[in-house]
Structures are given as C-alpha cells and as structure tokens.
Amino acid sequence: SRRQRQMCIRDSFIMANPPFNLSGWGADKLVDDVRWQYGTPPAGNANFAWLQHMIWHLAPNGRIGMVLANGSLSSQSGGEGEIRKNIINADLVDCIVAMPTQLFYTTQIPVSLWFLAKNKKQKGKTLFIDARKLGTMVTRKLRELTDEDIKKIADTYNAFVDGTLEDEKGFCAVVTTQDIAKQDYILTPGRYVGIEEQEDDGEPFEEKMGRLTSELSELFAKSHELETQIKERLGAIGYGL
C-alpha cells in the first residue's frame, strides 16, 4: 500500500518546523504505531510524535535539524520526560540551540533547534548552545539573526564535530550523556553553559564600593528631599501626613 511504501522511506537529511505544541493530532488512531520506539507521545502534545516520526525516517548515517517549542527540552508531562530520556540514551541528540525570542511573525513561543544524528561523530556527547542573546530587532516585534550570528552558531557546531571546541561560559558547552542524566535528562542549554564571565573593569574593589556607597548616599538624600516636598504639597491641600 501507499502508506507501507511511505513508512519504508529513509532520508539522509531531514529539516522540519512542525506546528508547536499541537493538540488533537490523532493520537487515538496511532496508539501502537511502530514509530514510537522511544515511548508513546501524549495525546495533548505532538512534539515528540513529530520528533519520533523524523527519527523513524532517518537513514543509518542520517541527520535531522528541527525546530521545537522550548517545553520539549524539559517537559515531564504525559511521559515526555521518559521519551526524551530514551532518545538521549540512544545517543541521537547531537546539539541543542536555545534561540532568541521574537523570531516568528505569528507566535511568541520560545523555541530551540534540535540536531539529531544516527551516527554521531562525538559519541556520548551533546553540544549545548545558548544563542538567546544573539539577533537584532528589525522591527518592534521581530528579531533576525545576522549572518555573523548564524556563522557563530555554525562555526561552534563544526568545531564540536571536529573535536576542537572549547567551552565558552554563557554560550556553549560540550556535555556527556552521564552529566545530562544527572540533570534528569533536561536539555535546556542554560543549565549547562553557565553564566557569561564579566570582564574585570580594573577598578579596585575598595574604590568601587566607596564610589557606589557615595552614589547611594546621594540618591537617599534626593529621595528624602522629594519626600519632604510631597508632604508639604499634600499638607497645602489639606491632606497632610
């Protein structure tokens, strides 16, 4: 049958941007589907149905690039945590990129890029990239990634594959499957990349504290002055404090 022929298709490269958090996707008709190798997706959310559908159609050396809502990185509801755990333990997750907000015209849902591979170069490791600070607002509501932003992400991934990448605090980290397991198989990049190191401005600590304390003292004085003026004005109209 046509369906049987379609189920036999195996692709080397798959790119997908399926609808986010789709409910009512026909789960009841696909309860024992062969594609659910890592667990049956919940009826109320198709994210892991899409993901497993793509994995099923992947050739032995195939790769997937997929956009999913951020909930998929950490959700435990409806068995999603177990499915994610099984996919991670199958060593399929090559890279996760947390994207900045406002990249879409039609939704504000924050998203991530999932890169999966059947035959990863870096076995037992996953690259996490936190790209939430990248991009430029081109209108009040829409952000775009510049060519430099895209190159930074691509270069980081290529260095990971080559085994030459060094972790960059606040941006990227290479993490073993064992360490992901210690984080309950949650794939949120922010958990792994840490906080960006702040550049030392060279001002000695004692001087900085002295300056900031002095500025705070001035602000307190101004605040007290304003408080007095407000009380006087309220008093003048018969509402004295």
Would you name each region that the model predicts?
Residues 2-9:
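Short, small-residue-biased leader/transition segments that mark boundaries at the very start
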Residues 10-239:
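A conserved structural/catalytic subdomain of Rossmann-like adenosyl-cofactor enzymes
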